[in-house]
């Protein structure tokens, strides 16, 4: 999977591509003129399929009959219908213009459940798919939406170009076809063209089907239990993931997509989070198990953290977060952010609500719905944005970088040491007024509560307006190691070192602690 933005399928190829009456003999003359496989689908969408009335050698009949699909029982032995043995231009109009139904016994015994085909990948965006096509002849079958209808697409790599061919259906018999031959099922269409190496569109044949990855899960592997929350596109559940018949199921968190009233573009945006998480593996980043895209509901399966979010812990009235734990959580967050930046991932929504804790007090960065891959990007878009956490260069010009994540990390430090207060909560400004105030420096976030001096210095360096002067995640980690003795990510190993730091601070209570130089 690639991390670039995914584009929804074109909505040009809809019902107009299907025959308009019970007749299923169609014109493919224009189709054979397509020379560039990269625009095959687009050209087909622009060419209306016409009904072809078979000419009679005698005097024209008063009321010509509309021909039906031609059905032949010995297609493999018939050279006149074998596109491998006869060039397209040498065929007579009658041969070229007919859509031929291939009976099931001519195809042979095939798998009739498309979910069981190893190269069927379920719902997938075009760009995401193209990242998997690398060699000539590679192909996969995926599901998309054309308008509001679900359709199958054959995506193939052919002579260093990617093509996406929509599988169409006839009006009355609902047969599947792409070029010349029609079948009762999509599985028969694929099996026949692959076995006989007959071009399924232009001169393209199906050579090497790309199998699904381990992270492409079947819906049957996931069991949904307690609902944990609800988001923009769906719900979050606690559930179980069955990875093997020999091992017990894993407790997971599952994001499910609402099944109704969502466009293809919204579904692609939902899966964008999984696209970013694919290559991530770090103790301070939420673990990604996989996605279920074979059928509804579409799901993202992730690690379940049984310790709630950092925001909930900070706001809890039952117990106050200790000074030791505050240091611990901020160190873990810095480690997670540094790992993301090393993978060229900009999170774009660092906040206490997106930091999860497990039972061992290990913090994990989560929620990659706004994340992008890259070192720096410029994006101007509306919608609901976390203005109170965003950097001034983002609010002013839509510019995102690793430095803008560090600015948000400063807001996280503020949340931790104010026991969960929202940044700029007391200034009384909201929305565009707050955005202008942050850009114009008329409001500045400060920590006025008791806080270790080195943490306060990190906070101040992270909130600098000049992105070049802002502290880096690597330097933040170094300071935590130097000042608090942190060298391991294991929570148990950290407690002793944190304790020794605070013991030293208490012994030097009356002395003014030195402020580290942050470079």
Curated annotation (Swiss-Prot):
GO terms for molecular function: ATP binding; non-membrane spanning protein tyrosine kinase activity; signaling receptor binding. Residues 119-208 form the SH2 domain. It is an enzyme of class 2 (transferase). Residues 73-84 have a biased composition (Polar residues). GO terms for cellular component: cytoplasm; plasma membrane. Residues 1-39, 73-97 are annotated as: Disordered. Its main location: membrane. Residues 85-97 have a biased composition (Basic and acidic residues). Expressed in hermaphrodite larvae but not in adult. Expressed in both male larvae and adult. Residues 209-490 form the Protein kinase domain. It is found in: Cell membrane; Cytoplasm. ATP binds at residues 146-154, 184. One of its GO terms (biological process) is cell differentiation. CDD domains: SH2_Fps_family (cd10361). The keyword Membrane applies. Pfam families: PK_Tyr_Ser-Thr, SH2. Belongs to the protein kinase superfamily. Tyr protein kinase family. Fes/fps subfamily. This is Spermatocyte protein spe-8. It comes from Caenorhabditis briggsae.
């Amino acid at each position: 999977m690639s991390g670039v933005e995914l584009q929804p399928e074109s909505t040009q190829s809809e019902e107009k591509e299907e025959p308009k009456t019970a007749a299923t003999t169609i014109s493919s003359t224009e189709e054979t003129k397509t020379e560039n496989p990269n625009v095959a689908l687009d050209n087909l969408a622009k060419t209306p399929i016409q009904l072809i009335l078979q000419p009679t050698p005698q005097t024209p009949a008063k009321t010509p009959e509309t021909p039906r699909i031609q059905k032949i029982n010995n297609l493999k032995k018939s050279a006149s219908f074998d596109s491998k043995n006869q060039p397209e231009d040498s065929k007579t109009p009658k041969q070229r213009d007919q859509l031929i139904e291939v009976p099931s016994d001519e195809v042979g015994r095939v798998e009739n459940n498309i979910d069981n085909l190893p190269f069927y990948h379920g719902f997938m965006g075009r760009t995401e798919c193209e990242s998997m096509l690398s060699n000539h002849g590679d192909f996969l079958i995926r599901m998309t939406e054309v308008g509001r209808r679900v359709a199958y697409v054959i995506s193939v790599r052919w002579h260093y170009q990617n093509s996406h061919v929509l599988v169409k259906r006839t009006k009355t018999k609902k047969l599947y076809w792409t070029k010349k031959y029609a079948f009762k099922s999509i599985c028969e269409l694929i099996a026949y063209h692959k076995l006989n190496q007959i071009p399924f569109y232009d001169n393209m044949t199906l050579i090497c089907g790309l199998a699904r990855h381990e992270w492409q899960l079947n819906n049957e592997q996931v069991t949904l239990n307690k609902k944990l929350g609800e988001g923009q596109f769906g719900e979050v559940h606690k559930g179980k993931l069955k990875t093997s018949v020999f091992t017990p199921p894993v407790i997971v968190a599952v994001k499910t997509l609402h099944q109704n009233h969502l466009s293809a573009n919204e579904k692609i945006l939902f899966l964008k989070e999984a696209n970013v998480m694919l290559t991530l593996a770090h103790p301070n980043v939420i673990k990604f198990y996989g996605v279920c895209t074979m059928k509804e509901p579409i799901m993202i399966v992730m690690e379940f953290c049984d310790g709630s979010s950092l925001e909930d812990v900070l706001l809890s009235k039952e117990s106050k977060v200790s000074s030791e734990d505050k240091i611990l959580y901020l160190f873990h967050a810095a480690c997670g952010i540094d790992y993301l930046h090393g993978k060229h991932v900009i999170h774009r929504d660092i906040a206490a609500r997106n930091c999860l804790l497990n039972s061992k007090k290990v913090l994990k960065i989560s929620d990659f719905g706004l994340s992008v891959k890259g070192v720096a990007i410029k994006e101007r878009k509306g919608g609901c944005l976390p203005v109170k956490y965003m950097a001034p260069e983002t609010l002013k010009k839509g510019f995102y970088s690793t430095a803008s994540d560090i600015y948000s990390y400063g807001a996280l430090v503020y949340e931790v040491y104010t026991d969960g207060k929202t940044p700029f909560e007391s200034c009384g400004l909201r929305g565009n007024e707050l955005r202008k105030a942050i850009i114009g420096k008329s409001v500045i976030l400060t920590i006025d509560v008791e806080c270790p001096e080195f943490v306060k210095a990190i906070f101040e360096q992270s909130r600098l307006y000049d992105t070049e002067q802002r502290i880096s995640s690597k330097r933040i980690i170094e300071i935590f190691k130097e000042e608090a003795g942190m060298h391991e990510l294991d929570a148990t190993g950290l407690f002793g070192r944190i304790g020794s730091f605070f013991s030293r601070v208490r012994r030097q209570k009356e002395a003014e602690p030195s402020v580290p130089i942050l470079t």
